[in-house]
């Protein structure tokens, strides 16, 4: 697992470098959008990006609501985050909820909002939060050394993304930060080549991809643990069964039917066995018969001799032919003349 994480970190770094080399700087204005995304397990993602200044003509089509900015001085804070908002006014649940704010940082009188991630009846802190985001954006654009970099910050329970210093249209912004499915807007296409490996824009589609990947990785790891545990239990059970059979049945894996373990030799019998001589062994029954299965083998039915065959009838008995008689003694007769 450590090797996989190290590889992902390297890919994240490569992806960020790839993104930073593909963009060009646009003429930025003080008009920005700020997004707030909440989801399951306390996930909070915020994003800040530039916006074309002609967005006022499109607020009606998307249902944005205009609200007057309350008099708030944000200069006391240098690093505003969702902790500056009223926590009870942030809507959190088991599903993803988004809110998009639009404002002109040069006009501290009005802002527009769309979405349900924040309860806008809590107007005490929202104005200061948005003015703090304006301050962060100006600092990001003015002090950035490379205009083709992405800044991702982890602030405790919040992930904040400072987008490339470009200007995005309202259509693309709403589609990327409010829709979980659909085609990727062309303006955000540079960010999505390897989005499962890095949080670059804190968008809704990106959050779905990341969280689904993490969920699948978790299920895969749990499945591996379950399979490993099951295999281990099976192996331990088989090992115990083999050991029981080994010690219970005299080193046999399967006990014969009807077999009873004979008692082991006593110390006295062991001593007597040591005193046996060669002549005694020739006469004795095989040594250590109690440890062998000789008694069981001899008494088993498979070793009983079959009954003898009946005698053959006399007429079928064939006797071998008798040998020819030996010739009689031969006598020599000698005739003498008279």
UniProtKB/Swiss-Prot annotation:
Residues 26-223 are lumenal. Its main location: host cell. Residues 245-338 are cytoplasmic. It is a single-pass type I membrane protein. The chain crosses the membrane at residues 224-244. It is found in: Host endoplasmic reticulum membrane. GO terms for cellular component: host cell endoplasmic reticulum membrane; membrane. Glycans are attached at residues 27, 54, 57, 68, 73, 79, 84, 108, 119, 143, 171, 178. InterPro entries: UL20. It holds the Pfam family UL20. Keywords: Glycoprotein, Host endoplasmic reticulum, Host membrane, Membrane, Transmembrane, Transmembrane helix. Belongs to the HHV-5 UL20 protein family. This is Membrane protein UL20. It comes from Human cytomegalovirus (strain Merlin) (HHV-5).
